[in-house]
Regions:
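Short, surface-exposed beta-strand/loop micro-motifs that present aromatic residues
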Residues: 77-82, 134-141, 298-300
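Extracellular/periplasmic catalytic domains that process cell-envelope and extracellular macromolecules
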Residues: 83-87, 143-145, 302-305
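Extracytoplasmic/secreted cell-surface and envelope-processing proteins
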Residues: 100-104, 203-204, 319
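Glycine-centered hinge/linker elements that transmit conformational signals in sensory
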Residues: 106-121
Length: 319
């Protein structure tokens, strides 16, 4: 019930306790999961992708078994207590079916009474995407030879708007359809492939990012890679009208479905509270207004940044 939820929230801030047994179990779980991590080609690709995107940022270095001995449970608890010692900068959003008259005194009892002070430390960004054109192609021994490529295009200059968010989503879905048709169906170069694009905002940083991926047949890798890159460039000139129409129909239906969930409204309220951007009211109208030309124009502007990263893992078939 709501009161139990708020009681747990209060304890989360004020009564962080040590549980040595649970911590020891967690470390053992990590040891098991990390033990054979280095043998996995998929993990090697994932690590290479992260390292290439963020310039080998030490904060994003993958955890290894040897690192676990340096994990201090006391320091973890200390950090948790530091972050919960001042509730002044926290915002609590409560969404759902509740009676305000019943809820208000509970908020006063369990949230308003949390420890707070005026000294608020603002967070700062510590990870940065590497700009320009970067290609990281490497070979890896694997039991079942296969080639896999990720291609990422991004733009940090275009503003975050609801319309840019919608256009990015449509563009990514169109690209995914094009990949499936040209790479899998027409060329027979892969069993699966796809793409997606997102727009995001965090404080004063905004990012539009498009990602294409393709686990491809090694003997057809050049063809698949060529299609992956060429399809993005082609979208600056022409975008398939039938694909756009199908995507819009799905997005409009999904809009009605997700509007019935608490998670959706939590996101809408969060963006409006932080940035004054209403992502709900005009959403369906803006989706309906998109055309192949608006998506093509979006792609032209998006690709002006010339930020394009490729990470490709090939099978090492040397003896």
């Amino acid at each position: 019930d709501v009161e139990t939820m708020l009681q747990m929230l209060y304890l989360y801030f004020t009564n962080i306790n040590k549980d040595e047994k649970s911590f020891a179990n967690l470390i053992e779980q990590y040891k098991v999961s990390l033990k054979n991590r280095s043998l996995s080609p998929e993990k090697a690709l994932q690590d290479s992708l992260t390292a290439t995107l963020y310039g080998h940022n030490p904060r994003l270095k993958p955890v290894e078994v040897a690192d676990l001995q340096h994990v201090s449970y006391d320091r973890i608890l200390e950090m948790a207590k530091e972050r919960t010692a001042n509730a002044a900068a926290w915002t609590f959003t409560i969404i759902g079916n509740f009676d305000e008259a019943t809820l208000r005194p509970l908020i006063c009892q369990y949230i308003a009474s949390l420890p707070s002070q005026k000294n608020i430390v603002k967070g700062k960004r510590v990870t940065f995407l590497q700009k320009g054109k970067i290609d990281n192609t490497f070979k890896r021994k694997m039991e079942t030879p296969k080639a896999t490529s990720f291609k990422i295009w991004f733009n940090e200059d275009m503003p975050y708007t609801l319309e840019n968010d919608i256009r990015a989503s449509i563009a990514g879905q169109v690209l995914s359809m094009v990949y499936l048709k040209k790479i899998r169906e027409d060329a027979g170069a892969a069993y699966t492939c796809g793409a997606q694009a997102t727009a995001s905002i965090e404080d004063d940083y905004h990012l539009i990012q498009m990602l294409g991926y393709c686990p491809m047949k090694p003997e057809k890798k050049e063809l698949a890679l060529s299609i992956m890159e060429g399809a993005v460039k082609d979208m600056t000139q022409t975008v398939d009208a039938d694909m756009v129409a199908k995507i819009k129909a799905v997005m409009l239906k999904q809009a009605d479905d997700v509007a019935k969930t608490n998670g959706y409204w939590n996101g809408v309220i969060g963006v409006y509270r932080k940035y004054g951007i209403d992502t709900h009211t005009d959403y369906k109208k803006l989706v309906s207004a998109q055309t192949p030309q608006t998506i093509s124009d979006f792609m032209k502007e998006f690709l002006k940044s010339n930020n394009y990263i490729t990470v490709t893992m090939l099978p090492d078939e040397s003896k």
